[in-house]
Amino acid sequence: TFVKYIEEGKGGWIGFHHATLLGEFDGFPLWQWFSDFMGGVRFQNYIAPLADGTVLVEDKKHPVMKGVQASFVVPDDEWYTYDKSPRPNVRVLASVDEATYTPASDIKMGDHPVVWVNESKKARNVYFQIGHSKRLYETEDFTKMFRNAINWTLGK
């Protein structure tokens, strides 16, 4: 039912953080369709303890990014890394500058998108890799993106 909803554009979808914890966990196989929907990524690692990081807006013209600063700090987040960048398969709206992690971390993936949409699906969709810490929901730029995402996925 979810696949049909997304493939046929029956509505919109907003995903957060844990949605890309993709792999074989607790005896469950990877859901290949959803991995493809998320840009073909497979969860690799994450940065612990939580770290601040600077997010760089790459696509200022997308409605989800309307009114969002060109860069902003995301506090205390758990930054996932993947086996590869989803960039070839999705439209990247923002990425994290891994050199800004505080505290610093050796866990990096290079090209590190953190907000994207998959335009190969009819449903309007947006995924936010950020979202582990409640502090994110207190930041102006994220709450603006989130409101924009709600309106955009609803077609408003």
Please place each PLM-identified region on the residue numbering.
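A glycine-rich, often tryptophan-bearing local segment used as a flexible ligand/cofactor-contacting loop or short
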Residues: 1-67
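Sequence-level detector for tyrosine residue identity
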Residues: 5, 33, 46, 80-82, ...
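Loop/turn elements at helix/coil->beta-strand transitions in domains of secreted/extracellular proteins
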Residues: 8-13, 87-91, 122-124, 156
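Solvent-exposed loop/turn segments at secondary-structure junctions
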Residues: 13, 19-23, 70-72, 98-100, ...
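Oxidoreductase and adenylate-handling cofactor-binding alpha/beta cores
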Residues: 30-39, 74-76, 82-90, 131, ...
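Catalytic beta-strand/loop cores that center a nucleophilic Ser/Cys/Thr
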Residues: 40-122
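Extracellular ligand-binding/catalytic regions of CAZymes and related secreted enzymes
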Residues: 99-156
